[in-house]
C-alpha cells in the first residue's frame, strides 16, 4: 500500500504540453505542490532548460535558481520544480527579461516576453467567495491567493487585476457577454474570443459560447473560461497568433506563403 505523497513522475505520464521526448530518460521533473495543478503547470526547470535553453542540465538550473535570479510573481523562487502556471509572471533580473505564461492556440505555454511595466501586475480568476470568521469577506483566486475585504461587486468567475508588489486588487472585469476571454482547458485550450452567451444548466456544467476575431464560434464549459479584457480590449499583451486557431488547411497555406516570400 502506498503511504504518503508520490515523489516521481514518469516521462510518458508527464503532461503533453511540456513537450518532453520519450527516449531521453525515464523520469520527468515532478512539480512541487503549489498554486497550480500538476497537469496545468510548467515546472521552472522545464521553462529554463527546455524553453529558454539557459541551462543544459537540471544541475545548471539549480545553480541558476540558487543564486536567487529567478522571480515568479515578484517573489524569488529557488525550487527548480516550482509549479508556475497560467498568468504567472517570471522575471529574470540578471537579463532584464520578463515572461508571462500564456497558452498558445495549440494549448502549450508560449514563451511570451512582456515589458517591465506589464510585469507589475497579473490577472486572476475568482474561484470562490466566502465570509470568514467575524464576518470578514474573503475571495480565492485561481492561483490560490486569498484576499480579504474585496470589493463587494466582485463575484465568482470575474477576473481581478492584482498588483504583484502589494498583492492588492487594483481593478476587476465582470464575467459578462461581450467581454474578451481566453479558454484555459478542454479542446479549445488557448483560444481567445468574445463571450456571446452563457447557457445555464443547474446541476450540470454551464456552457459558454465564444466567438473569435475571425468569426469562428465554439463552446466550452464555464470553468474553462478566463476573462482577459473588457469589450475587445485585452488587459494583457497576447502571444503571436492572438489566440485565433487556424484550421489545418489555413496553417498549410500560411506556411507556404511564408516559404514563398522568404524563398
Swiss-Prot record:
The keyword Cytoplasm applies. One of its GO terms (molecular function) is RNA binding. There is a cross-link at residue 230 (Glycyl lysine isopeptide (Lys-Gly) (interchain with G-Cter in SUMO2)). It is found in: Cytoplasm; Nucleus, Nucleolus. GO terms for cellular component: cytoplasmic ribonucleoprotein granule; cytosol; cytosolic ribosome; cytosolic small ribosomal subunit; extracellular exosome; focal adhesion; membrane; nucleolus. One of its GO terms (biological process) is positive regulation of translation. Residues 42-104 form the S4 RNA-binding domain. The modification N6-acetyllysine is found at residue 233. CDD domains: KOW_RPS4, S4. The keyword Ion transport does not apply. Its main location: cytoplasm. InterPro entries: KOW (IPR005824), Rib_uL2_dom2 (IPR014722), Ribosomal_eS4 (IPR000876), Ribosomal_eS4_C (IPR032277), Ribosomal_eS4_central_region (IPR013845), Ribosomal_eS4_central_sf (IPR038237), Ribosomal_eS4_KOW (IPR041982), Ribosomal_eS4_N (IPR013843). It holds the Pfam family 40S_S4_C. Keywords: Acetylation, Cytoplasm, Isopeptide bond, Nucleus, Ribonucleoprotein, Ribosomal protein, RNA-binding, rRNA-binding, Ubl conjugation. PANTHER family: 30S/40S RIBOSOMAL PROTEIN S4, SMALL RIBOSOMAL SUBUNIT PROTEIN ES4. Component of the small ribosomal subunit. Part of the small subunit (SSU) processome, composed of more than 70 proteins and the RNA chaperone small nucleolar RNA (snoRNA) U3. Identified in a IGF2BP1-dependent mRNP granule complex containing untranslated mRNAs. Belongs to the eukaryotic ribosomal protein eS4 family. This is Small ribosomal subunit protein eS4, X isoform. It comes from Homo sapiens.
Amino acid at each position: 500500500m502506498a503511504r504518503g505523497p508520490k515523489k516521481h513522475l514518469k516521462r510518458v505520464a508527464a503532461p503533453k504540453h511540456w513537450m518532453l521526448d520519450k527516449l531521453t530518460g525515464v523520469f520527468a521533473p515532478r512539480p512541487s505542490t503549489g498554486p497550480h495543478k500538476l497537469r496545468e503547470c510548467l515546472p521552472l526547470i522545464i521553462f529554463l532548460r527546455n524553453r529558454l535553453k539557459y541551462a543544459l542540465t537540471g544541475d545548471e538550473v539549480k545553480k541558476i535558481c540558487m543564486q536567487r535570479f529567478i522571480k515568479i510573481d515578484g517573489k524569488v523562487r529557488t525550487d527548480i520544480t516550482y509549479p508556475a502556471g497560467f498568468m504567472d509572471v517570471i522575471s529574470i533580473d540578471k537579463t532584464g527579461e520578463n515572461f508571462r505564461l500564456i497558452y498558445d492556440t495549440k494549448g502549450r505555454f508560449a514563451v511570451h516576453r512582456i515589458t517591465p511595466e506589464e510585469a507589475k501586475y497579473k490577472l486572476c480568476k475568482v474561484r470562490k467567495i466566502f465570509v470568514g470568521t467575524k464576518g470578514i469577506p474573503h475571495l480565492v483566486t485561481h492561483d490560490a491567493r486569498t484576499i480579504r475585504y474585496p470589493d463587494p461587486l466582485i463575484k465568482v468567475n470575474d477576473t481581478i487585476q492584482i498588483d504583484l508588489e502589494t498583492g492588492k486588487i487594483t481593478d476587476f472585469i465582470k464575467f459578462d457577454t461581450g467581454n474578451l476571454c481566453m479558454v484555459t482547458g478542454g479542446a479549445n485550450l488557448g483560444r481567445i474570443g468574445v463571450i456571446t452567451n452563457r447557457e445555464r444548466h443547474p446541476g450540470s456544467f454551464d456552457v459558454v459560447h465564444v466567438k473569435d476575431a475571425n468569426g469562428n464560434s465554439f463552446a466550452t464549459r464555464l470553468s474553462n473560461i478566463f476573462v482577459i479584457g473588457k469589450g475587445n480590449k485585452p488587459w494583457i499583451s497576447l502571444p503571436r497568433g492572438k489566440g485565433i486557431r487556424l484550421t489545418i488547411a489555413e496553417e498549410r497555406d500560411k506556411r507556404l506563403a511564408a516559404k514563398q516570400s522568404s524563398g
